[in-house]
Amino acid sequence: MKKIRKGDSVVLLTGRDKGKQGIVTAVLENKLVIEGVNIYKKSVKPNPAAGVTGGIIDKTMPVHISNVALVDGNGKPSRVGIKLVDGKKQRFLKTTGATLSA
């Protein structure tokens, strides 16, 4: 069971965007794509066959999962634990003990 999932609110712990909060939009192997965080400029060549115009675009790049933490109800970073509830795994916040939706 992954500790961080799509739709979770997270905060960046390291890097140039340290302290920024955002919503997870995609989960890759060990990386997350977070809305509004880790944005880089990429140059794109024009491709008329695909209908792509060339130029410089802003692209959201993935962040390693170890560099983020979930945000609890107080807006502070929290680690995530997993416990068994009625034979099913349930995620919970270690700072407050609150359970997260499946």
From Swiss-Prot:
Pfam family of the protein (one): KOW
* Annotated family: Belongs to the universal ribosomal protein uL24 family.
Q: Quick check: keyword rRNA-binding in the entry? A: yes
Tell me, how does this one assemble? Part of the 50S ribosomal subunit.
Organism domain of life: Bacteria
* GO MF term list: rRNA binding; structural constituent of ribosome
Identification of the protein by name:
Large ribosomal subunit protein uL24
Tell me the HAMAP family matching this sequence: Ribosomal_uL24_B
SMART domains according to UniProt: KOW
Q: Which cysteines are joined by disulfide bonds?
A: none
Q: Does the keyword Ribonucleoprotein apply?
A: yes
Keywords annotated in UniProt: Ribonucleoprotein, Ribosomal protein, RNA-binding, rRNA-binding
What is known about what this protein does?
Answer: One of two assembly initiator proteins, it binds directly to the 5'-end of the 23S rRNA, where it nucleates assembly of the 50S subunit.
Q: Name one GO cellular component term.
A: ribosome
Q: Which GO terms describe its biological process?
A: translation
